[in-house]
UniProtKB/Swiss-Prot annotation:
This is UPF0335 protein BAB1_1765. Belongs to the UPF0335 family. It comes from Brucella abortus (strain 2308). GO terms for molecular function: DNA binding. Transmembrane segments: none annotated. InterPro entries: GapR-like, GapR-like_DNA-bd.
């Protein structure tokens, strides 16, 4: 009886593991599809005359809180001033 319980538990664990792996694989495929879609949008953006590098910077900055962005901009300005770049 103990062996039956162990075998059943092992079967359940294997099933759970397989389900997790399959979910991750599906999500990875979705992530790839989304990445491809984003590349297409950047290509359209570039084709319309926009600078994709600048747009990427804007997107990165928009993800930050205002105070984080202001702090980063202040540090950038400080470093540029120190190097005589402003």
């Amino acid at each position: 009886m103990s062996d039956d319980i162990t075998s059943e538990a092992q079967t359940i664990a294997v099933g759970q593991l397989r389900a997790f792996i399959e979910r991750i694989e599906r999500l990875e495929e979705e992530k790839k599809t989304i990445g491809d879609d984003i590349k297409e949008v950047y290509a359209e953006l570039k084709g319309s005359g926009f600078d994709s590098k600048v747009v990427r910077t804007i997107i990165r900055l928009r993800k930050k809180e205002d105070h984080e962005r202001q702090e980063e901009e202040a540090m950038l300005q400080l470093y540029m001033d120190a190097l005589g770049m402003s």
